[in-house]
Structures are given as C-alpha cells and as structure tokens.
C-alpha cells in the first residue's frame, strides 16, 4: 500500500453509508450486493478504457498508467445531491493536511457513473471543489471524467464499485469509497465510507 493510501485510510474515519440525479439511459438491474464496494485488491485497470475530461478532451487511462505517481480514484456522479460531494470534500481536507503535493506525489481521478453527464457538468464540479484542495498543482493533477456505459461498466466492475438506479428515489444508489491505485494502475486499497456522510 502506498504512503498516500495509508495516510488517507487513517485520516478519514470510515462510516458505512450509501446515497443514491437524473434518469440514466437504462435502469441498472439491482442485485442483492448492489450499492457496495467489493474487494478488488490486486486488480490492474485496463489502460485502454476511454473517457472524456472536463475540458472536453479524450482521456484514456493509459495517460495515467503506467505513470510515476499513485492515483486516488473517486467514483460517483456529479449531480449527486449530497454524498459524492461529501466524499470529495473529506478527501481534499485530508490531502490538504498531508505533506505531499498533487502532481508530484499523487494524482486524483474522478469518474462519473452516469453516462448522461457531460464535460460541462464535470467542469462545473471541478470549479466548485478545486479551491478546497489547498495545494498548488491541484488543477493539473486532478482530472474529472465522463464516459459511455461500456467504459463506465468496465471500470466499475474492475474496481468492485457496485451501484444501481433507484426508481424509488430517482437517484443512483452507490457506496461512498475512495480507491487507491499504484502508478501501474493496480488497486491496492479502498476506503469504504467517510465520517459525516448521510444517506
């Protein structure tokens, strides 16, 4: 486990929770184990997975893996009414307290699980939260991505991030988690839950 992953695991108290935006292109079949973070330690992400970043540019995971820095991966969606923002805020508060610089020592990757979200939505998300990462280099070290269903499904399956569309709440139900990746794109840890998050 990387120094960064270990620090965040210790710095952010865990509290199991789940939260469910707008209607997806199709309903995700809810399973018994849906809306949970499964153990995916040791899995290496496919570097050919293709997304679009907050600037509207194509972004393949090979732009990060293999690389020189570990990566903190956050999955969720940007129109999430509460929890996704709370996870990001808690992560940024912890990262602001550690003696490591974004871009030099680690990178941050946000990926939306909602295939209807656009680069403009991703850009707005970044503009809202970037000031909370009180570190120089944060803008270039943090990519905020959107993608199609196929690439989203491949990424979430590989990382063990399970979610579904709730017709009851008209939102995505998903686990709060941070996933830690080596510079080679291998999953080495996950933080399941962040203190202070509600359902």
Predicted feature residues:
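Structural microenvironment flanking redox-active thiols in thiol-disulfide oxidoreductases
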Residues: 88-152
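Sec-dependent signal peptide recognition
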Residues: 1-7
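N-terminal "domain-start" segment that seeds a small globular fold
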Residues: 26-63, 86-96
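Hydrophobic h-region of N-terminal signal peptides that target proteins for export
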Residues: 8-18
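Short active-site neighborhood of thiol/selenol oxidoreductases, capturing the structured segment around
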Residues: 61-91, 108-110
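Cleaved targeting-peptide boundary
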Residues: 18-27
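Thiol/selenol-based redox catalytic cores and closely related redox-interacting motifs
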Residues: 132-199
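Extracytoplasmic
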Residues: 44-46, 66-70, 103-108, 139, ...
């Amino acid at each position: 486990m990387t120094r960064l992953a270990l620090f965040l695991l210790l710095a952010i108290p865990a509290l199991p929770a789940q939260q469910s935006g707008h209607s997806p292109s199709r309903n995700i079949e809810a399973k018994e184990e849906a809306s949970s973070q499964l153990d995916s330690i040791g899995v290496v992400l496919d570097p050919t997975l293709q997304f679009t970043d907050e600037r509207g540019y194509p972004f393949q995971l090979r732009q990060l893996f293999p690389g020189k820095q570990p990566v903190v991966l956050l999955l969720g969606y940007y129109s999430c009414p509460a929890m996704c923002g709370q996870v990001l805020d808690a992560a940024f508060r912890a990262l602001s307290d550690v003696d490591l610089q974004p871009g030099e020592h680690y990178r941050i990757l946000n990926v939306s699980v909602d295939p209807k979200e656009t680069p403009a939505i991703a850009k707005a998300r970044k503009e809202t939260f970037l000031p909370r990462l009180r570190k120089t280099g944060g803008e270039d070290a943090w990519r905020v991505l959107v993608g199609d269903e196929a690439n989203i499904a491949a990424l979430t399956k590989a990382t063990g991030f399970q979610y579904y569309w709730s017709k009851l709440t008209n939102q995505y139900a998903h686990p709060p988690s941070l996933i830690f990746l080596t510079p080679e794109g291998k999953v080495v840890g996950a933080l399941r839950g962040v203190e202070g998050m509600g359902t």
